Amino acid sequence: MEPSWLQELMAHPFLLLILLCMSLLLFQVIRLYQRRRWTIRAMHLFPAPPAHWFYGHKESYPVKEFEVYPELMEKYPCAVPLWVGPFTMFFNIHDPDYVKILLKRQDPKSAVSHKILESWVGRGLVTLDGSKWKKHRQIVKPGFNISILKIFITMMSKSVRMMLNKWEEHIAQNSRLELFQHVSLMTLDSIMKCAFSHQGSIQLDSTLDSYLKAVFNLSKISNQRMNNFLHHNDLVFKFSSQGQIFSKFNQELHQFTEKVIQDRKESLKDKLKQDTTQKRRQDFLDILLSAKSENTKDFSEADLQAEVKTFMFAGHDTTTTAISWIFYCLAKYPEHQQRC
C-alpha cells in the first residue's frame, strides 16, 4: 500500500513547516484584503484624490503636507479619506460639525496611531480604554479638583509673566519672534511646578533641554512612522535607521521620567524632606505614588511611568500647540484680536 500524501508530508517536517507558513501568509493576505474592501465600502460616500493601489496617497502626503492640506481642505471641506499603503486609511475631518458627531461615538481608539504613541508614552490615559482607563481616571481625578486648580493659577501666571518678559527683551533686539519654543518652555515650566512640585524655572536654565529634544524627535519620528505603512510593523521599524534613533531618544525620555519618580521616592524616605512634603499640598505625582503603594495589583510601576510620561508629554505638547495656534489665528485675524 502506497503512503498517502499526508503521510509523505508528515515524513518531511521542513515541507510541513513551509506549508504552515504559506497557509498563515495566505490567511493574513485574505484578512487584509477583506479589511480593505470593508474600508472602501464604508468610505465610498466621501470623495478623495486618486490613490495608488499599493502606496496610497504617499506621493503627495505627508512629505509636502503643509502645501497639500490647504488644497485638500478647500477641495474637500467636510472630510477626506487618505490611504497610507494598501490596507490603512486615515479619515481626515475638516468640518467642526463632523468632529462633534465623531466625539459623541464610542468607537475604539485608532489601532495604528495609539500603538505608535504607546511605544514611547506607555499605556496611560491617552492610550488606554475600557475598565483600565476608568481605573486610571479614578486615580488621577483628585488631582483635578477645582480647589487645587485654583492654587495653580498663581504659579501659571508667574510662568506666563516670565515668558512675556523674555519676549520684551527679544523684541527690543529683533522684530521677529518664533513663538512655539517659548510657549513650549512656559507650558512645561507650569506643569513641572504644578504637577511635580519642581523647584526653579525651566525657562531660565537648561536642565530639561535633553527632555524637550527627546520629545520633539519622538513626536517627529512617530508622525513620520504613522505615514509610512512599512514602518507600522514593529520589527521593520525597529531595524530601520529611524527606529534606531527613536530607540535612543526613547531611552533618554525613560531615564528622565524615572529620575523624576525616584527623586520623589527618595524625598519621601528622608524624614526631613517628608515633613516638608506633607506640609505642602499633594501634587499629581504624590497621588500616583499613593495609588501605587495602596494598590500594586491594579497600578504597577509601568502604569506609574506611563501616567507620568503621558501627563508630561500630552499636558505640555497639546497645550503648546493650542496656544501657538491661538496666537497665529489672532495675528491673522486682527479684528478678532481687538474683540478679545
UniProtKB/Swiss-Prot annotation:
State the UniProt keywords alphabetically. Membrane, Signal-anchor, Transmembrane, Transmembrane helix
UniProt topological domain (Cytoplasmic) ranges:
1-9
Which Pfam families does the protein's record reference? Answer: p450
- Subcellular localization, as worded in the UniProt entry: Membrane
Annotated signal sequence is none
Q: According to Swiss-Prot or TrEMBL, what is its membrane topology? A: Single-pass type II membrane protein
What is any one of the record's Gene Ontology cellular component terms?
membrane
Report what the protein is called.
Answer: Putative inactive cytochrome P450 family member 4Z2
Species of origin: Homo sapiens
Query: Which gene carries the instructions for this protein?
Result: CYP4Z2P
